[in-house]
Amino acid sequence: MRVVHVASEVFPFSRSGGLGDVLAALPAEQARLGANVTVVSPWYATLSGTPQEVWRGEVPGLGPVGVGELRASGVRFLFVSLPAFERPGLYHPDDVERFCAFGRAVLPVLQALGAVPDVLHGHDWQAGLVVAHAHLAGWRTAFTIHNLQYQGRWNLAEARTWTGLPDWTFSPEGVEFYGDLNLMKAGLVFAEQVTTVSPTYAREITTPQYGEGLEGVLIRLALEGRLSGILNGLDQDRWNPRTDPDIRPYADPAGKAANGSVLRAEFGLDDAPILGVVSRLANQKGIDLLIEALPELVERWNVVVLGGGDPLLTAALHGWAYHPRVAFVSGLNEALAHRIYAGADAFAMPSRFEPCGLSQMIALRYGTLPIVRETGGLVDTVPGDVGFRFADATTEALATACRDARTTLEDVVEWQSRMKRGMELDFSWEGSARHYLALYRHLCSVN
């Protein structure tokens, strides 16, 4: 089985969030299971690693295009070099135009390298145009929604010349969306099978509350049997409390306490239990609810927050950092994230929506009990007899769940029993990888 994944980022070469993590772990597991796997991504100026150039040529409508290659974990990584990506950083305001160029380059590159796959699998809107071109070329295609909120939209009158698509595709049945080009919709419409990253999120996005305006398309896909949810896994080598070099390793609840002491010492916290948060700072993640709940939370918890994003939320958290029970570090810090997962007692994820989420799985693996809103992948991964769940996206609902967790924490036997059950849950990528490979085999068996 020859599989090509296409995505805008892949850890450790380029990463801004969970998408990059998925594109590191899923292809590696598929390769371990015997598939021939290639990942195609842009060759960013700030790429970590030095690919070896394996091809350079002209692509109609784009001009010179180069391709670099790296290999790791049994996977071939191809990086497409285009002028639009020769600048610092991953994402920019003109990304629709940039990823249209990328989308037009991928098929000619794969053809030139003799790497035409059995199935091309695109991820999120940045790969939507690739899926459209692959489908029109007669290739088997799958497409995964990682976050429906981001759709890659631009005024169609300006953007249509960027795509290389035939005129008939610029319609409401195709890639047009209220006068815009919509690259997420391109992936949905032209993929033979569409997946998203948890079963609950697959159901949620067929409703107006979560469908981001595309629920009509998604309802049709569901009725046609073309929409499903496959839960993401967790890289259990990278996130392993037994071997993690950034913490004091431990294998059971009893060994966790030393990491709490380290975290308290690092931030000058008292002996109150620690509520951890590692998150992008956005209203989607419910960080505004967390901030509104802080006056009550600090009565019974130390609160340690790591994350970057929305300037207003960042400023609000900086305003709380004076409090002796609040610690806030702005930005990304991988080692500190590991210390928070290991040192906190509980972990808050009050997301308004969460397609899958990785943080709650990491927290469970580290014996840190999640306090989560019942949405998306949080429903599918946090059992009610392990973590603490609440239904409404309100400050009061979050505060109530945190009160319940704090009360339960007083029962040492119950708390450690929950920790043990959480640490024993299996979030390995093997099950997810097998589900995707079965989906590919189904695609290849259909005439």
Curated annotation (Swiss-Prot):
Keywords: Glycogen biosynthesis, Glycosyltransferase, Transferase. The keyword Glycosyltransferase applies. CDD domains: GT5_Glycogen_synthase_DULL1-like. Pathway: Glycan biosynthesis; glycogen biosynthesis. InterPro entries: GS/SS, Starch_synth_cat_dom. It holds the Pfam family Glyco_transf_5. It is an enzyme of class 2 (transferase). SUPFAM superfamilies: UDP-Glycosyltransferase/glycogen phosphorylase (SSF53756). It comes from the Bacteria. It catalyses: [(1->4)-alpha-D-glucosyl](n) + ADP-alpha-D-glucose = [(1->4)-alpha-D-glucosyl](n+1) + ADP + H(+). ADP-alpha-D-glucose binds at R15. One of its GO terms (biological process) is glycogen biosynthetic process. Its EC number is 2.4.1.21. One of its GO terms (molecular function) is alpha-1,4-glucan glucosyltransferase (UDP-glucose donor) activity. Synthesizes alpha-1,4-glucan chains using ADP-glucose. PANTHER family: ALPHA AMYLASE DOMAIN-CONTAINING PROTEIN, GRANULE-BOUND STARCH SYNTHASE 1, CHLOROPLASTIC/AMYLOPLASTIC. Belongs to the glycosyltransferase 1 family. Bacterial/plant glycogen synthase subfamily. This is Glycogen synthase. It comes from Deinococcus geothermalis (strain DSM 11300 / CIP 105573 / AG-3a).
